[in-house]
């Protein structure tokens, strides 16, 4: 069995200093001392270190009351610490009996109680700071992770229950945070600092157990087992079943012996259960019941989730079946679509092949006609070539003339510039010479200033040396004065020590007054604290009332929210179905627009190909553009048709009338036209007409409009052709000069009017809208050409507008599809969120209801605490009145003591005058030294300023010298430049004479070339008329070829659209599809039937509505989750069943153990009762014998000669003996390592004290007894005695004495 070895206290109640009590291994130890000295604090310390959670049981209000609160001479400590050491004699390796404390009967001469007190306080503060919990460093955190068993989270005892009924269970007490706390606290955020401790783990020996408990004023608390941090539960586990557990019967505190009889039957049962060793089974049962409740709660949540997942799985199962049907029908539709597309591709390829064969024939015909036209173009080109040669020579001559004129202008400008520069150089040289003279004078003045500053620098250095010597002398004088002052102050300190000794005589009286005042102050603080706690409890009750109302509202609100969410979910599902139907319709519309867009793109490509390749032009023009010979600056701007736009109703009329003119090649210069003619004569066969753009400087004079050539009138029935044509890119009205037919052309409403006007105006051309052209006595007509350049471009513009419209509609449609997809996604997300909110609301409603019930229980506990605070307020008020009455007498004693102190102070002041004179002398010497130091610093600063000024002047001298050299160089360079410019002007005058003669010769040659050019142009116009007829036949063939090109382009566009459909629908390209040989190629009715079937399948797919293709995968995942939840549900059911079986087994074991212990203790109780009373009868009985598991225990006691029905009718002494008899019965059945009895013998008379002591001696053979007593008989029975004194007010001290050896020697 364990034995109590040692008890250490620090800062616990009145034991502010480190105090140690060493107990013998067995027998009896007595603790004695006067009332109020702190004897019972030792018993409280042992109860506290073993885990007592009730501040009331420790004679306090709050748990912080156990921390030393301070006195007049001592400040409060920062913590309370108690360590309890027990040993196992069979395994302990050290000494069981410690050496005695040496007690001396006299004080040493140098003993200083104040110094000893101060040293003790410092030691306590240092130790408190050392063990104070805090945030760990990185190295300490690593150490803590390496040894997790040595650390535990700090706990707070500020909120510990203050009554026995409110004591927290060990499972959630200090050192073991609850589940809610564990969910909030981050385990890595704040940890307990790993720190060095005075009780290191390596000091404990085998067979030794040391339990330590600490409580800090911050509210942090910790438990240690053999120096390692542990939990309260660990401490309870060690002592559970030994009589030292939570229901301890081994520690009988002052006044508690009678409570054993007056307590409730259920409380007495707890003592018997502790003795029977079933407390640990009770704890296990309580934990098992808690686990059972948690498992049931988890099962309820799992059942809810299981039901929800089951419903979700059934829904997904239906969606998965629909998705399977959809996928099957979609695969059939795609297979049918593959056959249809492959057949259509084959038909399109065959039709394109036929058109390309016809296109080849038409191309050969065009080549034949082109050769015929080419011969005539060659003849026309020879005539044009001479005109180009003349134009080139004229151009070169004009360029030479322009170059000469530019050179003459530049030479004149250069000569004027040189003359101005020469005048500027003369003025600059004069200014530079003047600046050189001024700078030379400045250099002389700077050299004089430099010499003066050097003399000042030498003088400043000498002054600094003298000031340093004077400073050293005055510093020595100041040091001597300070030494004299120090000697006198030492003598004065000796006098002050004498006064201090006199003050100590008065301090004893003042201490008593201060203690009384402090007690009143403490009572005031306690009154304020209790008032605050009362107010806090009142506010807490009010707050709980508000919270209860709030929780009720939250519960109702949660239910209302769940109902509202159900309605919103129904609406969201309806909106989602509608949006999905709109999305299907929008996608169908987008597919139609894409097909139309592909057709328009094909048509646009065909038209652009014909226009870009100039398919409407002559072969010569086409080959000229295709050859690429005209590059860089000679690139053609296009043909004349590119510069004209005509109203739609006049397009065919203008195209037939200006058939040849529209093919004119527009170039930017005559050089480009010459290069084109060269190509037509060489690499490119054929003829062409070139039109020079008005931007050319030579051609612009040919485009001046002669208004005199116009008809004198414009009939109202006639529309001038120029009004129907809009000319682009710089031609404007000047195009009428180049094309006389344009200025003389008119459009009439019918042929009769045209014929009549043609006879009246033989120079004009009159065109009817039916295609006839009347000129003088000729008329031209016939079938109109199908398409010309103007109509092709107009058609291209129409196609481009259609493409823009379709693109806009397609973008809108795609945006609509995207918007609907986004809305569907948002609605899906909203639906999911609403369902999540609904589930969360259901959980919140459940949580609110549970919290509401907890709050009502908490309100009941707060009401009980409120009543306790009211009773405590009354007690504090009564004690304060008693203390105030005692202060009056103490103040009279204090006045006499202070008078003596004032006499000693007067003597001290008389000796202070000489000390003031020495201080004045020291201050004067220090002041003189400071002035000398300041003067030396000023002279040093003057020396530094002189050196800096000298350096600045030397820098200026260098700069001025450099400036003089630079100015002389500028004067020399100006003279050289003036001479060079005068020589250049003479050369320019000679060149001007030569350039004047060259310009006159060039002007004469230009006039000759202009005359010859006009003659050549007239001949070219005659040749062009002959080409007109041949080109008309060629244009008809080209029209047919254009139609064939358009047909091929249309078929290719259809093929591209189907290829895009193939990729989008089948995810396969056209070549890959055509490579599949096993696909049948349908034609005619078979193809139409297959196409209809695949469209019907597509319609069925669309009619199926939205299909969740992810349902298959979601169904699998939900099924797996369903299976997992089912497994979890089964595990919880098994856990609940196992826990219930465990509780039943615990109930059976505890019943057997209790019955056995009850019978044995009852028998021992009866024997001890008879022994203490000398007869009589005492026994226990169950209040409910039919239900022994939960029955309370009643005590029946009948002393000799009495027959009592209630133990409460016994006297105080009889109650004590009866209760002690019960304790003896318990100890005889289940002895505890030690037993503490606090003034249990107080109510007993001398006879009963003797009996009591005799029984204690008998029991001390097995159990170690610690008796706190005032009885001399009891003291005599103890071989070891501890005396508790309070020499210093409010501070308890311990003195121990062993009597056993002295008694043995006396007997010998």
Swiss-Prot record:
Residues 137-169 have a biased composition (Low complexity). It holds the Pfam family SMC_N. InterPro entries: P-loop_NTPase, RecF/RecN/SMC_N, SMC, SMC_hinge, SMC_hinge_sf, SMC_prok. HAMAP family: Smc_prok. It comes from Koribacter versatilis (strain Ellin345). It is found in: Cytoplasm. Residues 637-757 form the SMC hinge domain. Residues 115-181 are annotated as: Disordered. Required for chromosome condensation and partitioning. Residues 278-600, 791-1046, 1110-1148 form a coiled coil. Its main location: cytoplasm. GO terms for molecular function: ATP binding; ATP hydrolysis activity; DNA binding. ATP binds at residues 34-41. Belongs to the SMC family. Contains large globular domains required for ATP hydrolysis at each terminus and a third globular domain forming a flexible SMC hinge near the middle of the molecule. These domains are separated by coiled-coil structures. It comes from the Bacteria. This is Chromosome partition protein Smc. Keywords: ATP-binding, Coiled coil, Cytoplasm, DNA-binding, Nucleotide-binding. Homodimer. GO terms for cellular component: chromosome; cytoplasm. GO terms for biological process: chromosome condensation; chromosome segregation; DNA replication; sister chromatid cohesion.
């Amino acid at each position: 069995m364990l034995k109590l070895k040692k008890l250490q206290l620090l800062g616990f109640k009145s034991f502010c200093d480190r105090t140690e009590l060493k107990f013998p291994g067995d027998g009896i130890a007595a603790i004695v001392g006067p009332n109020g000295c702190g004897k019972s604090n030792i018993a409280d310390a042992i109860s506290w270190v073993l885990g007592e959670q009730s501040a009331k049981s420790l004679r306090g209000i709050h748990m912080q009351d156990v921390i030393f609160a301070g006195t007049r001479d001592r400040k409060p400590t920062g913590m309370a610490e108690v360590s309890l050491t027990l040993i196992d004699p069979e395994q302990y390796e050290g000494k069981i009996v410690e050496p005695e404390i040496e007690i001396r009967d006299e004080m040493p001469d140098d003993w200083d109680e104040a110094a000893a007190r101060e040293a003790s306080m410092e030691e306590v503060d240092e130790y408190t700071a050392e063990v104070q919990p805090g945030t760990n460093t990185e190295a300490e955190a690593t150490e803590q992770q390496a040894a997790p068993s040595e650390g535990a989270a700090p706990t707070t005892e500020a909120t510990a229950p203050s009554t026995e009924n409110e004591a927290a269970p060990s499972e959630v007490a200090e050192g073991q945070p609850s589940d809610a706390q564990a969910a909030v606290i981050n385990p890595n955020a704040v940890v307990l600092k790993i720190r060095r401790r005075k009780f290191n783990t390596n000091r404990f020996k085998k067979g030794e157990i040391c339990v330590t408990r600490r409580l800090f004023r911050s509210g942090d608390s910790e438990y240690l087992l053999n120096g390692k941090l542990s939990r309260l539960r660990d401490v309870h586990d060690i002592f559970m079943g030994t009589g030292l557990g939570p229901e301890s019967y081994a520690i009988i505190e002052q006044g508690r012996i009678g409570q054993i009889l007056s307590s409730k039957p259920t409380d007495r049962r707890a003592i018997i259960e502790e003795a029977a060793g079933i407390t640990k089974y009770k704890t296990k049962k309580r934990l098992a019941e808690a686990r059972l409740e948690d498992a049931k709660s988890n099962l309820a949540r799992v059942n809810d989730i299981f039901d929800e997942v089951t419903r979700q799985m059934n829904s997904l199962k239906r969606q998965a079946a629909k998705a399977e049907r959809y996928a099957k029908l979609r695969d059939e539709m795609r297979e049918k679509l593959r056959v249809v597309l492959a057949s259509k591709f084959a038909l399109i390829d065959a039709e394109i092949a036929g058109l390309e064969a016809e296109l080849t024939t038409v191309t050969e015909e065009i080549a034949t006609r082109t050769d015929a036209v080419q011969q005539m173009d060659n003849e026309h080109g020879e005539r044009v070539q001479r005109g180009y040669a003349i134009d080139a020579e004229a151009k070169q001559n004009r360029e030479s003339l322009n170059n000469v004129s530019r050179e003459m202008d530049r030479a004149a400008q250069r000569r004027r510039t040189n003359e101005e520069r020469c005048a500027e150089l003369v003025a600059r040289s004069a200014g530079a010479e003047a600046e050189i003279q001024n700078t030379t004078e400045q250099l002389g003045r700077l050299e004089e200033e430099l010499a003066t500053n050097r003399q000042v620098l030498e003088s400043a250095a000498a002054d600094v040396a003298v000031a340093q010597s004077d400073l050293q002398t005055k510093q020595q004088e100041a040091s001597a004065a300070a030494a004299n002052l120090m000697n006198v102050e030492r003598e004065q300190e000796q006098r002050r020590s004498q006064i201090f000794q006199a003050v100590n005589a008065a301090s004893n009286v003042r201490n008593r007054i201060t203690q009384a005042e402090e007690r009143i102050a403490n009572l005031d603080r306690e009154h304020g604290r209790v008032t605050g706690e009362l107010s806090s409890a009142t506010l807490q009750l009010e707050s709980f009332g508000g919270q209860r109302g709030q929780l009720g509202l939250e519960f109702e609100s949660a239910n209302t929210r769940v109902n509202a969410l159900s309605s919103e979910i129904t609406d969201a599902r309806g909106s989602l179905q509608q949006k999905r139907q709109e999305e299907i319709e929008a996608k169908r519309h987008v597919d139609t627009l894409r097909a139309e867009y592909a057709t328009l793109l094909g048509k646009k490509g065909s038209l652009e190909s014909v226009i870009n390749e100039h398919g409407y032009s002559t072969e010569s023009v086409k080959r000229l553009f295709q050859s690429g010979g005209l590059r860089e600056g000679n690139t053609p701007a296009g043909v004349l048709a590119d510069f004209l736009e005509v109203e739609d109703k006049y397009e065919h009329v203008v195209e037939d009338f200006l058939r040849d003119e529209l093919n004119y090649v527009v170039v930017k210069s005559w050089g480009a036209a010459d290069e084109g003619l060269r190509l037509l004569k060489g690499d490119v066969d054929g003829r062409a007409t070139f039109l020079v753009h008005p931007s050319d400087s030579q051609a612009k004079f040919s485009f001046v409009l002669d208004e005199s050539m116009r008809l004198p009138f414009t009939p109202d029935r006639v529309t001038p052709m120029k009004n129907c044509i809009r000319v682009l890119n710089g031609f404007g009205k000047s195009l009428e000069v180049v094309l006389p037919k344009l200025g003389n052309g008119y459009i009439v409403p019918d042929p009769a009017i045209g014929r009549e006007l043609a006879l009246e105006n033989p120079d004009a051309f009159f065109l009817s809208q039916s295609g006839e052209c009347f000129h003088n006595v000729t008329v031209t007509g016939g079938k109109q050409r199908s398409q010309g350049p103007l109509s092709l471009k107009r058609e291209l513009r129409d196609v481009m507008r259609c493409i823009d419209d379709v693109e806009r509609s397609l973008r809108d449609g795609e945006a609509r599809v995207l918007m609907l997809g986004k809305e569907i996604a948002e609605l899906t997300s909203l639906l999911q969120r609403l369902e999540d909110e609904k589930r969360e609301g259901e959980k919140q409603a459940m949580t609110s209801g549970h919290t509401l019930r907890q709050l009502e229980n908490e309100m009941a506990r707060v009401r009980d605490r409120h009543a306790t605070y009211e009773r405590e307020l009354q007690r504090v008020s009564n004690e304060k009145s008693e203390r105030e009455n005692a202060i009056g007498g103490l103040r009279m004693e204090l006045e006499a003591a202070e008078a003596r102190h004032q006499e000693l102070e007067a003597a001290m002041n008389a000796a202070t005058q000489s000390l003031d004179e020495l201080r004045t002398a020291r201050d004067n010497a220090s002041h003189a030294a400071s002035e000398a130091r300041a003067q030396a610093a000023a002279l040093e600063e003057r020396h530094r300023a002189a050196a800096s000024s000298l350096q600045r002047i030397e820098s200026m001298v260098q700069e001025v010298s450099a400036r003089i050299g630079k100015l002389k160089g500028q004067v020399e360079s100006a003279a050289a430049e003036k001479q060079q410019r005068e020589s250049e002007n003479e050369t320019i005058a000679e060149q001007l004479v030569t350039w004047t003669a060259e310009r006159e010769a060039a002007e004469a040659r230009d006039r000759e070339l202009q005359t010859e050019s006009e003659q050549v142009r007239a001949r070219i116009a005659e040749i062009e008329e002959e080409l007109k007829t041949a080109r008309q036949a060629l244009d008809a063939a080209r029209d047919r070829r254009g139609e064939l090109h358009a047909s091929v382009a249309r078929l290719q566009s259809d093929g591209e659209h189907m290829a895009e459909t193939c990729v989008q629908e089948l995810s396969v390209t056209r070549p890959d599809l055509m490579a599949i040989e096993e696909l049948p190629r349908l034609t005619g009715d078979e193809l139409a039937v297959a196409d209809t079937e695949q469209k019907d399948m597509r319609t069925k797919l669309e009619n199926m509505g939205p299909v969740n293709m992810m349902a298959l995968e979601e169904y699998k995942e939900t099924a797996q989750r369903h299976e997992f939840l089912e497994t979890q549900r089964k595990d919880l059911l098994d856990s609940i069943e196992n826990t219930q079986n465990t509780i039943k087994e615990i109930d059976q074991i505890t019943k057997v153990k209790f019955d056995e212990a009850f019978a044995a203790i009852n028998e021992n109780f009866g024997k001890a009762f008879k022994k203490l009373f000398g007869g009589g009868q005492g026994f226990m009985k169950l209040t409910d014998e039919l239900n022994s598991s939960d029955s309370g225990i009643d005590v029946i006691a009948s002393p000799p000669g009495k027959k009592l029905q209630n133990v409460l009718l016994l006297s105080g002494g009889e109650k004590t003996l009866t209760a002690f008899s019960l304790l003896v019965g318990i100890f005889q059945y289940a002895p505890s390592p030690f037993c503490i009895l606090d003034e249990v013998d107080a109510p007993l008379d001398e006879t009963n004290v003797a009996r009591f002591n005799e029984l204690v001696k008998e029991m001390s053979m097995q159990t170690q007894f610690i008796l706190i007593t005032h009885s001399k008989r009891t003291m005599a029975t103890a071989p070891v005695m501890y005396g508790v004194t309070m020499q210093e007010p409010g501070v308890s001290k311990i003195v121990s004495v062993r009597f056993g050896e002295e008694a043995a020697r006396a007997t010998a």
